[in-house]
Each structure stands twice: as C-alpha cells, then as structure tokens.
C-alpha cells in the first residue's frame, strides 16, 4: 500500500492529493505511510506527503511521511457490539426497554457515511416481560438497512465527531408483555452517538481497528439531539395498548458501542482487517 501511494504521489503530484483531502472534518479515512521518492529537480529522494504522524498536522513543505486517503479501503466492513453498560431505550415518560446486548454489522460507504446491514437487540425486557418482534425469538429485535452520517459537534476541546443513525420509515414494530396482553411498540426516527477515544484505543485522530461510539440520554432526552445548526435527530416510540389506547413519546438510547473495522470473512485473517481513522483536526 505504501509503495502504491508513493508512486501515485510521484505521478500526480502533491496538488492531486491536496484536492483528495479537501473534505471538511470530521471524516473517516486512512493515514498512509509513504516511501521516499525523487521529485522533479531533486538530487535525492524525499518524502512528499502532506502530513506528519496521524495526518493531523499539515507539513507546509509537503515533505511529510504520511498522506491522507479519505474513506475506507477494500476491507470496509465493521462489526459493533454494546453490552457494558447494558443498552437501554427510555421514553420521556419513563418507560424502559432494557437489553443485554446490542450489535450491528455493515459497511463504511464513504468518508462520511456507513450502512448498517443488520442491527440486533437481544435479551430485551420491559417491566420484566420480554420484548420481541417474533414470538419464537424471545427478547430479540432486528432492524435492517440503517444509514449513518458522520457530522461535527462543538466540544470543550474543539471539534468532535458523531454518527447519526437514521432509517426511512419505522425501525421496527415489536411486542412487549405477555401473549395474552401485549403492548405493541413502534420505534421510529434517528439518533446521534458521539465518537470517543474509549480507553485510548479508539480511532479519533489516530489509526485504529477499534472505534467507540457513546449514545447518551437522560430520561428519554438524547445528548446531543442535533448537529450544530441542524434539525433535531431523535427517536420516538408509539405504544399501542389493548383495549385501544395509543401514545407517542420521544425516546433516548443509552449504549457504549465498540466497533471493529475491516472485519471481512473470515475475520481472523489479517488481510480482512484494516485500521481506519476519524479525523477531526483541520486539513492541509
């Protein structure tokens, strides 16, 4: 990979790479180590990258050892899981759906986008009774084809990155309670989770196979509810009880998600894994 990037640098020149990296942060991509190349009029090989280590500090002379490549590489898959603390959906009215595990798998589709192919909630209960879409799979809720968009937030130390997850139409309709007296729940809307460094292993401004996303809510109110200057992205739950009575309430999600990138199949093979970086620092 390093050799390929070095050859591309020599062929296209630094202006091509500067335009490639022109997207405003935050964005997901790869900080790639270069090889020395011989530039026009030079007597000995030099590095010709736009950045230093982690691609967060521009090199004004374009003699940096690294180049930024927006978006994922060929190993663009990911698998994510949340189990500690256990994920919770809570309405502003205090109704909770508590699950033991939340997991998803999908693909990064660009420098600011992803698609979750399958999203699972398992071990879900409300007031001690199971919540599920299929009576044969107690406690399980599955959602497909969720879109993710990377956006920016103003944090105490500068720009922060966050994912908004959204789906056209209903996320899922499921039942909580007993078979004889169920409550029908319908989850809709969108939700924002902030990208964090985790315990120092995350991919914020550094290359890593791990990414951490914190979905935080208090009493059904998501924190945050929107990107800077943008409309709110919040979830809502429509609850249908019998005899007929329907209520709709804003809903918050709390979960700390650990996502591993580049996990193709079989996942244990090194060629199916790739480090990525979510960069929040200014571009060159």
Task: Name these PLM-found stretches.
Residues 23-284:
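Extracytosolic secretory-pathway proteins
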Residues 17-23:
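Sec/Tat signal peptide C-region and signal peptidase I cleavage site
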Residues 4-15:
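Bacterial N-terminal signal peptides
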């Amino acid at each position: 990979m390093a050799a390929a990037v070095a050859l591309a640098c020599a062929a296209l020149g630094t202006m091509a790479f500067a335009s490639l990296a022109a997207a405003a942060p935050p964005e997901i991509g790869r900080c790639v180590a270069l090889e020395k190349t011989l530039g026009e009029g030079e007597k000995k090989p030099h590095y010709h990258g736009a950045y230093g280590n982690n691609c967060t500090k521009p090199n004004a002379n374009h003699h940096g050892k690294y180049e930024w490549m927006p978006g994922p590489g060929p190993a663009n898959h990911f698998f994510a899981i949340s189990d500690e603390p256990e994920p919770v959906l809570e309405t502003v009215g205090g109704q909770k759906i508590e699950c033991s595990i939340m997991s998803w798998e999908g693909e990064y589709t660009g420098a600011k986008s992803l698609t979750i192919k399958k999203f699972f909630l398992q071990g879900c209960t409300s007031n001690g009774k199971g919540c599920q879409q299929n009576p044969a799979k107690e406690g399980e809720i599955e959602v497909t084809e969720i879109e993710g968009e990377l956006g920016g937030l103003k944090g105490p130390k500068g720009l922060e990155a966050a994912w908004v997850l959204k789906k056209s139409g209903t996320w899922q309709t499921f039942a909580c309670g007993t078979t004889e007296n169920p409550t029908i729940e319908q989850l809709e809307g969108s939700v924002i989770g902030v990208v964090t460094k985790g315990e120092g292993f995350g991919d914020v401004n550094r290359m890593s196979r791990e990414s951490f996303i914190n979905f935080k809510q208090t009493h059904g109110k998501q924190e945050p509810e929107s990107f800077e200057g943008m409309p709110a992205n919040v979830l809502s739950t429509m609850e249908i009880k019998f005899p007929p009575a329907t209520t709709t309430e804003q809903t918050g999600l709390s979960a700390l998600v650990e996502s591993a990138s580049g996990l193709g199949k079989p996942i244990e093979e090194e060629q199916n894994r790739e480090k990525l970086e979510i960069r929040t620092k200014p571009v060159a």
